[in-house]
Regions:
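PLP-dependent amino-acid enzyme catalytic core
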Residues: 1-303
Length: 303
């Protein structure tokens, strides 16, 4: 049956043509912006709602609650609209206008916390609302249905699309659902694959990626599934994001730039490697933030 949810996943995997190092390594990127709501989070959103339905925990007409920095909220709003749920989303007020508008366009109710409260504050308020009986908290940070989506779809797709040639997998870490699920799948395959996570450097702010305080570390994260964690500076992420657009024709967001910056670093240090990175969303969600402003290109920054 051809319904919207059946268009989620099976995204393209493409090889970078101009940005990779000249040492025999290959850098491939999985274009998750091709999902219907525009990001890798479509996979987790569908999984969290469908699996909860299977367990009888929710049914159409219910109120669902989630804290989000943007992409998960947009994806959940889409699935909620498709299946007939009322979606309440909590988000820091410094996230881009495009993200807010997309959530509201799908009919979601958006509740903003301050920039200072951040994602930690959004998560705390979402939990309080659920405890008051205001709806069912999906809790992407602690919900095993989040990484399950990537264990059953993203991981197998990457293995098939590389014909098992992958040597390194690189992913930005926010909820850690993508890296946890993909790593779990790759660990079960016939050859070792190095798993590399990306987090912002101290003092850097990259939308969608977090350097979590210990007390807020997502419960779904399993450190044994990650071989190395690289720190990425905000400027490196933004410059790589712009390079992807100008030199590869790939229009993506800042966290994707961070992931590819990390992948290029890994490829440069490992001649002959086959490195796969997740390009988790599209660049149109960041236009109002100025990261694609004319000054970056007229001065040559990021090109």
């Amino acid at each position: 049956m051809n319904t919207l949810e059946h268009t989620i996943g099976n995204t393209p995997l493409v090889k970078l043509q101009r940005l990779g190092p000249d040492n025999g390594s290959e850098v491939w990127v999985k274009l998750e912006g091709n999902n219907p709501a525009g990001s890798v989070k479509d996979r987790a959103a569908l999984s969290m709602i469908v699996e909860a339905e299977k367990r009888g925990e929710i049914q159409p007409g219910d109120v669902l609650i989630e804290a989000t920095s943007g992409n998960t909220g947009i994806a959940l709003a889409m699935i909620a609209a498709l299946k007939g749920y009322h979606m309440k989303l909590l988000m820091p007020d410094n996230m881009s206008q495009e993200r807010r508008a997309a959530m509201r366009a799908y009919g979601a109710e958006l509740i903003l916390v301050t920039k200072e409260q951040g994602m930690e504050g959004a998560r705390d308020l979402a939990l309080e609302m659920a405890q008051r009986g205001e709806g069912k908290l999906l809790d992407q940070f602690n919900n095993p249905d989040n990484p399950y989506a990537h264990y059953t779809t993203t991981g197998p797709e990457i293995w098939q699309q590389t014909a098992g040639r992958i040597t390194h997998f690189v992913s930005s870490m926010g909820t850690t659902g993508t890296i946890t699920g993909v790593s779990r799948f790759l660990r079960e395959q016939s050859k070792p694959v190095a798993i590399v996570g990306l987090q912002p450097e101290e003092g850097s702010s990259i939308p969608g990626i977090r350097r979590w305080p210990a007390e807020y570390m997502p419960g779904i994260f399993n450190a044994s599934l990650v071989d190395a964690v690289l720190d990425i500076h905000q400027q490196d992420a933004e410059n790589t994001m712009r390079q992807l657009a100008v030199r590869e024709g790939i229009f993506c967001g800042v966290s994707s730039g961070g992931a590819v910056a990390g992948a290029l670093r890994v490829a440069g240090e490992n001649p002959g490697a086959v490195v796969v990175a997740i390009v988790c969303d599209r660049g149109d969600r960041y236009l109002s933030t100025g990261v694609f402003g004319e000054e970056h290109f007229s001065q040559g920054a990021g090109i």
